[in-house]
Amino acid sequence: MAKMVDALQPHCDEEIVAAMTCNHAGSMSSFLISKLMGSVGAGTKSSRLPNPVFIAVGSRSIYAFDYAPRGFKFKIKKEVARWPKDEVSVVAEKTNMMTTFVLTTGSGESYPLEVPTMMGGKELVDVFLNALDASQD
């Protein structure tokens, strides 16, 4: 997670305590299905956030960034959203392979996102969810 925090810190006006690259909920399974079945259902967009999106958590705000992966590094393109942390609720549900969570803002917008937890990612996701103050099922 340190590389993710380091990539985002220069773009935020407060200390970032956690960061994670996330996908729109369902997009990872949709990607696998599209590879098996062709482009059926490709191109659907369910959010104003880019997919994938980089989410950063500070003590006062939650940030969303558009980014491009560059090998094991990240090229941050631009900030696409910022919400006061105390106005965002997060509910998470974990499975063995995936954690799905929904960010709901004070204005009522909801952003269902997902992060893989396989291959040792569970501990990093737990740190991220704790920083978000997520309630977990």
Please describe what each predicted stretch is.
Residues 1-55:
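Anionic N-terminal interaction surfaces
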Residues 13, 21-23, 100-103, 132:
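Lipid interaction determinants
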Residues 26-27, 71-74, 119-123:
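A short local loop/turn or secondary-structure capping micro-motif enriched for an aromatic residue
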Residues 26-29, 63-64, 109-113:
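Short, surface-exposed beta-strand/loop "edge" segments at domain boundaries and coil↔beta transitions
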Residues 35-98, 105-109:
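Phosphoinositide-binding peripheral membrane targeting modules
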Residues 107-126:
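Canonical phosphoinositide-binding patch of PH/PH-like domains
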Residues 128-137:
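A membrane-cytosol interface segment of integral membrane proteins
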